[in-house]
Amino acid sequence: MRVVVISSFVSVSLQLSFLLLLASAIRSSSSPPNDPFLGISPQDEKYYKSSSEIKCKDGSKKFTKAQLNDDFCDCSDGTDEPGTSACPTGKFYCRNAGHSPVILFSSRVNDGICDCCDGSDEYDGHVSCQNTCWEAGKAARENLKKKIETYNQGLVIRRQEIEQAKVGLEKDAAELKKLKSEQKILKGLVDQLKDRKEQIEKVEEKERLQKEKEEKEKKEAELAAQQGKGDAEEKTDDSEKVEESSHDEGTPAVSQHDETTHHDEIGNYKDYPSDEEPAAEGEPTSILDEATHTNPADEHVVERKEESTSSEDSSSPTDESQNDGSAEKEESDEVKKVEDFVTEKKEELSKEELGRLVASRWTGEKSDKPTEADDIPKADDQENHEHTPITAHEADEDDGFVSDGDEDTSDDGKYSDHEPEDDSYEEEYRHDSSSSYKSDADDDVDFSETTSNPTWLEKIQKTVKNILLAVNLFQTTPVDKSEADRVRKEYDESSSKLNKIQSRISSLEKKLKQDFGPEKEFYSFHGRCFESKQGKYTYKVCAYKEATQEEGYSKTRLGEWDKFENSYQFMSYTNGEKCWNGPDRSLKVKLRCGLKNELMDVDEPSRCEYAAILSTPARCLEDKLKELQQKLEKLMNQDKPQNHDEL
């Protein structure tokens, strides 16, 4: 019995010893690191060294420096155990000198696997980890060196583009100023041409209406002539009967007729109905009929009258008789002139005008309405016309119209008594008419002086001046069609040029309002598009305009230019075409340093939201270059790490 008890006691003692040894081994494997700040990033070291009491980052508790990395989790967020695996949410920082740092979950510490290239995560000695950071960092250092070289070259290009941007902006501003000045001058010229064109069109319209009126009156006169033809023939027959009866009775018909014909005709013309007094029935309805169908008796009277006048001239030796004979002869000549003129112009004058014309010639009274018969010149009138200048007031009273009869007269030369207008007057008036409108351009440019190589604007100014001088709207001849067409053509061309200038001004003003970056480094982007072919799509990004996705002849608008974002790190395009049952398309282009402008890596990370990368010298910043150089210098100055051997 005693032997059994002793053996049981020995067995329990052995088990306890084994458990103690096992616990000791476990305790030894999870022992805290020798470096209390192991696993802490350089940025967080200050947080842990600031005071003797450290607060958990979530603010739940506080712990002392002795509790830091003691292999017991005091903070739920793992703040107190960055270098051990005690807290499941803790993070371990691999320094990896000579290569890139890495952050691990604390659960990987002392797990028998070398996660850090420097082997710092397996510090308990159970696993021997070689330090491979230097070899592993060699490729990273080479990439860093290449990146620094790219920044160096890109920075040179960027500086050049900035200088070019300054020159370009100055050029744009100078061009805008010049165009505004040219616009002001050209607008004045266009306004002058427009005024002259409108004046010509008004005159042409008046001429058209006048021509229609004359054609209408001509038709009415022809109709009246046909209606009065029968009455005129009847009157002729009556006159022949009267003459025959006078001869049969033995009466001196010629002398009586000479004495009474003049007064009878005056009476007939005066008795002709005016505009307010309609002609009585049975009487001739048109003077044109009388002028066209001349009474043979009247012709006989005129001939006999001329014979008696010539005989009286030869039989009367006194001055008084000669004067009377001369006066009668002149009167007869005047009557013949009137008859001839009426015969020639019967188709061009209305019946009222013919009546007033004949009556005024007989009575010596001047008709209220001037007719073309008034244009028949006399010898005295010709002499006075040659020496009498036309005043500006008279020119203004002339509305510039002339009937078709006048035009035919000047062409046929039937009434060549008209003397040509004085050229000196015409030149003087042209000069006055061109000065009737004075634009601001007259203050800036002298039309009389041209350089050996005149600019387009000077050529236009000279052409417009010549046109305005050549086209005289107050002349007494109809508007010259060729000159009118010339005015219209020059107006159209000048207006087109003005529209182009105004469009260019608007474009320049919009351009100068764009955001080209703090140093205008993105000035070269204006008006440029960058393309990238990816699969079946071609992506096109146009700065300050739009971005599109093209497939064959199909085009999808990804967005309109919006702005730069995040300190000019992104270009934003918004309000693209709407996705079916989704949002409007949009695009964000990330800008990075490169030696040329190149669009790449277009993707659609979210539905209808596109992303792309654009390399450009504009993003090769000097501050970023210095940062890269410091990083490389730090890596190169590190000693080559030694192998992490087991202790």
UniProtKB/Swiss-Prot annotation:
Motif (Prevents secretion from ER): 644-647
UniProt feature, compositional bias: Low complexity: 311-320
Keyword DNA damage: no
Region called Disordered, residue ranges: 206-453
Expressed in which tissues: Expressed in roots, rosette leaves, leaf blades, mature stems, cauline leaves, flower buds, flowers and siliques.
A cellular component term, taken from the record's GO annotations: plastid
Localization: Endoplasmic reticulum
Pfam families on file: PRKCSH-like, PRKCSH_1
Keywords (A to Z) from UniProt: Coiled coil, Disulfide bond, Endoplasmic reticulum, Plant defense, Signal
Main location: endoplasmic reticulum
BP term (GO), one: defense response to bacterium
Compositionally biased tracts (Acidic residues): 395-410
Phenotype of the disrupted gene, per the record: No visible phenotype under normal growth conditions, but mutant plants have compromised defense response induced by the bacterial elicitor elongation factor Tu (EF-Tu).
Coiled-coil stretches noted in the UniProt entry, renumbered to this chain: 155-235
Source taxon at top rank: Eukaryota
PROSITE patterns in the record: ER_TARGET, MRH
Pathway(s) of this molecule: Glycan metabolism; N-glycan metabolism
Keyword Endoplasmic reticulum: yes
Composition bias type Basic and acidic residues, residue spans: 206-222, 230-268, 290-308, 326-355, 363-388
Signal peptide: 1-30
S-S bridge residues: C529-C542, C579-C608, C593-C620
Function field: Regulatory subunit of glucosidase II. Essential for stable accumulation of the receptor EFR that determines the specific perception of bacterial elongation factor Tu (EF-Tu), a potent elicitor of the defense response to pathogen-associated molecular patterns (PAMPs). Required for sustained activation of EFR-mediated signaling, but not receptor FLS2-mediated signaling elicited by the bacterial flagellin flg22.
Subunit text: Heterodimer of a catalytic alpha subunit (PSL5) and a beta subunit (PSL4).
Protein name as annotated: Glucosidase 2 subunit beta
Organism ancestry: Eukaryota, Viridiplantae, Streptophyta, Embryophyta, Tracheophyta
